[in-house]
């Protein structure tokens, strides 16, 4: 996926969900761990040289898996490129757990699944589709997946 560099730089300056200096090792063989300032903004993980204001890279946190590798180390692996693995070293186990949790929750897919879940719950409790008022209830991206029971059809108008 291609991105406009100026837009990414602008996005990298927005308020962060999480930011810290972490050890980071890239996906190439022979890459070594380097201190990087890492910022989580929406579903992007930006990384900077510690003395610079513009990011040297960004990871789009979609279609990836986040795993704890060690007590203070986690990795990000992209599902379509298993060899593309990034390692991050934290200062503590707690910091590592917080980063893993934040990154998992940053993805569009996580947010979509939550929306579908809460939509189903609201519909179950009230009998109303909360998305109907916005005219988006029939959009595929908001449909219930096979893990959840399907929404019953709306009641006929009275």
Swiss-Prot record:
Pfam families: PH (PF00169). InterPro entries: Boi1/Boi2-like, PH-like_dom_sf, PH_domain. It comes from the Eukaryota. Residues 15-108 form the PH domain. GO terms for biological process: endosome organization; receptor recycling; retrograde transport, endosome to Golgi. Disulfide bonds: none annotated. One of its GO terms (cellular component) is early endosome. This is Pleckstrin homology domain-containing family J member 1. It comes from Danio rerio (Zebrafish). The gene is plekhj1.
